[in-house]
Amino acid sequence: MDAAALERDAVQFARLAVQRDHEGRYSGAVFYYKEAAQALIYAEMAGSSLEHIQEKINEYLERVQALHSAVQSKSADPLKSKHQLDLERAHLLVTQAFDEDEKGNVEDAIELYTEAVDLCLKTSYETADKTLQNKLKQLARQALDRAEALSEPLTKPLCKVKATNIKPKPPPTRTHFPLGTNPFQEGPQPFISPQSCDAQGQRYTAEEIEVLRTTSKINGIEYVPFMNIDLRERFAYPMPFCDRCGKLPLSPKQKAMFSKWVRPEDLTNNPTMIYTVSSFSIKQTIVSDCSFVASLAISAAYERRFTKKLITSIIYPQNKDGESEYNPCGKYMVKLHLNGVPRKVIIDDQLPVDHKGELLCSYSNNKSELWVSLIEKAYMKVMGGYDFPGSNSNIDLHALTGWIPERIAMHSDSQTFSKDNSFRMLYQRFHKGDVLITASTGVMTEAEGEKWGLVPTHAYAVLDIREFKGLRFIQLKNPWSHLRWKGRYSENDVKNWTPELQKYLNFDPRTPQKIDNGIFWISWDDLCQYYDVIYLSWNPGLLKESTCIHSTWDAKQGPVKDAYSLANNPQYKLEVQCPQGGAAVWVLLSRHITDKDDFANNREFITMVVYKTDGKKVYYPADPPPYIDGIRINSPHYLTKIKLTTPGTHTFTLVVSQYEKQNTIHYTVRVYSACSFTFSKIPSPYTVSKQINGKWSGQSAGGCGNFQETHKNNPIYQFHIEKSGPLLIELRGPRQYSVGFEVVTVSVVGDPGPHGFQRKSSGDYRCGFCYLELESIPAGIYNIIPSTFLPKQEGPFFLDFNSVIPIKTTQLQ
């Protein structure tokens, strides 16, 4: 953080606060006094040497408290008339016409200029306000003059052309690819051809295009990939824009309080997209999206601390400096990272209010500021409405920023957690700006929540991490903007706070006693005890190399559980060139979600398992043992981190796994690395498949070779291969039985060479599945005997032959 820049922010905010205070605009004054105080808090954290900084902070916060009653009693400024709003819309039409004019899009520019003229003339006839009439007529003249100037070159040549030769302008087509080689990297994105895919220059396959097309439809609405052409989206209209998808469904709590839908100009006479990006001004209401609001808060805090656009860059329209702007026509476009790629979400600006005119959605404490409510609305639209089932910050932050999600469970039997190592990592990475962090509580009783000032299963934004003489602290914000921690180091704790610690943390217990904004300090030990999960979102810029594959796993492929066989699981080869000093490779598995019920009742437990098998296909889950075993969780995102320490080439097999496969899933596997790598699906070398359906029944359930008297009664099949080549044989039987098979040579054609054999087996008998893969089997005739380990184990089985050469099979017994 830049202390000098924060000091300048504080001076600017204080000046605006005092100005509004003197003008009697108390709501604005309250907002800017808070922002000035927060800027000074951050400046002190960054090493500011300003004298009496704490006194100034307290002065601003005391003025906030004093103004609260004045805000309640003061009547609001009059709202703009319809005709004033029409003038603003006309100005936007002309502005967007001028943009198209500059780009040489003559026909689009003429259309926009003409609509501006029509709107200005219509409104000038309707209003009796002479000043407004003059402004409208002046704007109409300017627009008309430019439209006529543009029309002249078009109309002159057309006079010589026969009408039959005139063809209508074709509608624009979406032939461009989503922005950028890596849409998550900062900076301008290069244009990419329609076929391109990723940072490694690969093209999308037909399967990938179909995956992205299929998962574009979310809750019945299509959200297409965000493309270069979308930067030319039209935002100016003569009438207020209405989303053709209709109003968002409300939650039951909203319905109970709902009065009507309003636009920003119905609430304030000076709507603005962003006054200042602040985590402290964001307030959640009755929508159950605490994790989303916490995600907005930490994104805003990041922007303020590091002066890098993160959250405010995703909403359009934007000016030429890339800053989001208020649109009097009411149309907005938000770029969200959904189902594998950045996608385009169109909304209008209608928001729900209660009978008192209070918003029933999240909002900024500065009521004229819109970005919080509009970004929330876009996300709620995708999620099916304000009746949001709830989420977690990994999902929300990935959608908002594209940053890499990671989950740390502090009380999990399957995941180890080190308090000391975790704190050191979080402290270092947080202050470098590498990571965004939230913390969530788990299930607790109402009495426990009341005792400790915590909300059960609730997400809190992490705003700061500090350490002082061996004591470790986390600063949290409750998205509700009220209700704080009541344990150690709360504002009411008279035992543990020392003057020295208060100075270091810039904390005066008297200040929060005056105003509850939901922000508090908690010790790291208490957070680890009373909270359940820490959600991290990593800056993808840390790992410059990235590529992805989009794919589908059909529910019909393989068994429901992959506890015994991975033969039908999607598998990938990852080859990494590790430099001196080591490297990190992260693999993010993201399941695409297209249905609200799926999101609310996520029953798909996914994971990624890593094997060191030189990129070869893995058939048995535990043979060889996994290099990194995955934990199956019902979150759409799963991150695997591979740490490399020795230089050279490292080759891995990555296996997508589910706990119980019930449904077909679409997913994206994205690899991030600081060093070069290649990543691809493991292809099947086989082009010919043949399946035999058989069963062990009665006498034919003879068991393995240990049972000589009955083993000879097992089914026997014969297969004939005309040419030498590779062969894969798989046997699937009931999971409760251990199964295996033998292959016996009957005859071969010519000299079998080194690949000849008399007898081969599938190895140890295994539950439900076994296989034998031969690099080359000589041309000839062979018998195969499938069996269970014990006699009298009856049931069906499947024998699958996979080769590049046609196979003839017959049953001998």
UniProtKB/Swiss-Prot annotation:
Q: Point out residues bearing the modification Phosphothreonine.
A: 95
Task: Tell me which UniProt keywords the record has, alphabetically.
Answer: Acetylation, Hydrolase, Nucleus, Phosphoprotein, Protease, Repeat, Thiol protease
Key word Protease present: yes
Q: What class of enzyme is it?
A: hydrolase
List the residue ranges of the region (Domain N).
Answer: 702-813
Q: Name the Gene3D superfamilies on file.
A: 2.60.120.380, Cysteine proteinases, Phosphotransferase system, lactose/cellobiose-type IIA subunit
Single GO molecular function: calcium-dependent cysteine-type endopeptidase activity
Q: Which positions does the record annotate as the modified residue N-acetylmethionine?
A: 1
What are the start and end residues of every segment in region (Domain III)? 541-701
- Spell out the InterPro entries in the cross-references: Calpain_cysteine_protease, Calpain_domain_III, Calpain_III, Calpain_III_sf, MIT_dom, MIT_dom_sf, PalB/RIM13_Calpain-like, Papain-like_cys_pep_sf
Q: Name the coiled-coil region(s).
A: none
Q: Which family does it belong to?
A: Belongs to the peptidase C2 family.
Q: What does this protein do?
A: Calcium-regulated non-lysosomal thiol-protease.
What is this protein identified as? Calpain-7
The protein's organism comes out as Sus scrofa (Pig)
Q: Lineage of this protein's species?
A: Eukaryota, Metazoa, Chordata, Craniata, Vertebrata
